[in-house]
Amino acid sequence: MFRATCNTRDFKKVINATSNLVDEICFEVDENGIKASAMDPSHVALVSMEMPKDVFEEYEGDIQDIGIDLEALKKIIARGRGDEKLILDLDVEKNKLNITFKSNVTRKFSIALYDVSSSNLKVPDIEYPNSVSIKAGAFVEALKDAELVNDHITLKIDENKFVIYSKGDLNQSETVFDNSIDDDDNALADFNMGEASRSTFNLAYLKDLTKSTAAEDLLKIYLGSDMPVKIEYEVSGSKLVFLLAPRIES
């Protein structure tokens, strides 16, 4: 069986963040909570989410895989209000996931499930030379600046600085977060440099990765030369991890 009750607002954030990259996902349910990982259709990005049982008000889950149409789930969750309780209930016989919004009014939906098994996708255990923790709002603003110039972006670590750089045929954009200078906004919360590095990425993917973040969310970004960038952040106890392959420049 599977039945869980949680805050609609928090669950919506997790689903929105995940569905920005993938349309289908397999919820791996057990007594400890929900885990899921999926690749985007182009196999450029991997998304992983983990919702431990502690983030739910009530939780019961046996070991099983639940194939979810994320686009359908996202549309239904969008109808929920932040003050409503959200109840997820698996109907094994009908192969459906029942979704209930509960306040002084009760609204019920159900979605058909895919017949899938666990993909066994895991976030690879990569040792990164560098990492930064940065407020999502500051990172997103730098992406918006870069978008004016090109559809690719370079992330650099060098000389105690985190640099977000984009160059077109005629124009360029550069945002520098200097760890040696005190920042009143505390945009750069943590900086760990092992070696100078630079990697280039598809800007559209990075925008999708961060589309559902709040300005004050803290992004943990792991970097190395020509390595996938790993971005982690939390939503009210749930953990989201994104991995994006670099663009190898000739």
Curated annotation (Swiss-Prot):
CDD domains (alphabetical): PCNA
GO biological process: leading strand elongation; regulation of DNA replication
Keyword Nuclease attached: no
GO molecular function: DNA binding; DNA polymerase processivity factor activity
Pfam families given in the database record: PCNA_C, PCNA_N
Record-linked InterPro entries: DNA_clamp_sf, Pr_cel_nuc_antig, Pr_cel_nuc_antig_C, Pr_cel_nuc_antig_CS, Pr_cel_nuc_antig_N
Keywords: DNA replication, DNA-binding
Domain of life per record: Archaea
PROSITE patterns per UniProt: PCNA_1
UniProt keyword GTP-binding, yes or no: no
Disulfide-bond pairs as recorded: none
Family: Belongs to the PCNA family.
HAMAP family given in the database record: DNApol_clamp_arch
Subunit structure: Homotrimer. The subunits circularize to form a toroid; DNA passes through its center. Replication factor C (RFC) is required to load the toroid on the DNA.
PANTHER family (UniProt xref): PROLIFERATING CELL NUCLEAR ANTIGEN (PTHR11352:SF0)
Free-text function comment from the UniProt entry: Sliding clamp subunit that acts as a moving platform for DNA processing. Responsible for tethering the catalytic subunit of DNA polymerase and other proteins to DNA during high-speed replication.
Protein name: DNA polymerase sliding clamp
Organism: Methanococcus maripaludis (strain DSM 14266 / JCM 13030 / NBRC 101832 / S2 / LL)
Originating gene: pcn
